[in-house]
């Protein structure tokens, strides 16, 4: 069972979230720099911050729409105007935004709905998930990691479904189809932490990736640009 799913069933407590720029998902690098012996500074985090996974029946009983936010906050006992309420507002807006051209997307509020979206998008129920695994409980420090091994994630058919943990009162995942290349990377931290981290490498010019190209000083779409996935993100692929 992937760690991301295991931790939804048995939520992991988390310290306060790091700044957006400090998280592993926002450290971009070129695919050519992903090789044994390379080093980079990373901070593995959880967007869901230990939020519990709701049974499908319970999740389906709670509204999930921006226009219903006051009702949602009341049902979930989240104070209006609080940082948590603001984060939920942002998540709902992101979930309601139109998908990018050629992309299918859905925000999954239960494990069952996530599996259904992955299966329908990949054209088969014979799917499995992979996620980043870190060998220590709780938050890890921002530190230097050394790449020990790099292995491609086998992807039958060339496409997969990525599901990203989102800030909400319970576990919510923003899922979308992608043709990014994926790798499992063995990392060793300066403090002895070991990680089997998922890296996704993109060649598209989506706004977020386009900004990464600018940071790295290369033309958009010219070479693959990569980032690691946080511990509560998942990639669904065909078996």
UniProtKB/Swiss-Prot annotation:
Which keywords does UniProt give here?
Signal
User: Could you confirm whether the keyword Signal appears in this record?
Assistant: yes
Q: In which tissues is it expressed?
A: Expressed in leaves and shoot.
InterPro entries per record:
BURP (IPR044816), BURP_dom (IPR004873)
For this protein, the record's PROSITE patterns field holds: BURP
The signal sequence is 1-19
Domain BURP: residue ranges: 28-239
Q: Which domain of life is it from?
A: Eukaryota
Name under which the protein is recorded: BURP domain-containing protein 6
The record lists the organism as: Oryza sativa subsp. japonica
């Amino acid at each position: 069972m992937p760690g991301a799913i295991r931790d939804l069933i048995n939520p992991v407590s988390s310290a306060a979230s790091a700044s957006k720029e400090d998280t592993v998902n926002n450290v971009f690098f070129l695919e050519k720099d992903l090789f044994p012996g390379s080093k980079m500074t990373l901070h593995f985090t959880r967007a869901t911050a230990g939020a519990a996974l709701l049974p499908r029946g319970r999740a389906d009983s709670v509204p999930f729409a921006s226009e219903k936010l006051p009702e949602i906050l009341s049902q979930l006992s989240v104070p209006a105007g609080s940082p948590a309420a603001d984060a939920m507002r942002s998540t709902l807006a992101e979930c309601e935004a139109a998908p990018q051209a050629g992309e299918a997307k859905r925000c999954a509020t239960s494990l069952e709905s996530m599996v259904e979206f992955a299966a329908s998008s990949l054209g088969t129920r014979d799917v499995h998930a992979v996620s980043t695994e870190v060998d220590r409980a709780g938050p890890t420090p921002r530190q230097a990691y050394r790449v020990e091994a790099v292995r491609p994630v086998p992807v039958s058919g060339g496409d997969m479904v990525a599901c990203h943990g989102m800030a909400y009162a319970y576990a919510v995942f923003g899922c979308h189809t992608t043709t990014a290349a994926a790798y499992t990377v063995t990392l060793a931290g300066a403090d002895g932490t070991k990680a089997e981290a998922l890296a996704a490498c993109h060649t598209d010019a989506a706004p977020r990736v386009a900004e990464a190209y600018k940071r790295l000083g290369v033309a958009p779409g010219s070479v693959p640009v990569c980032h690691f996935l946080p511990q509560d993100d998942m990639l669904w692929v065909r078996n």
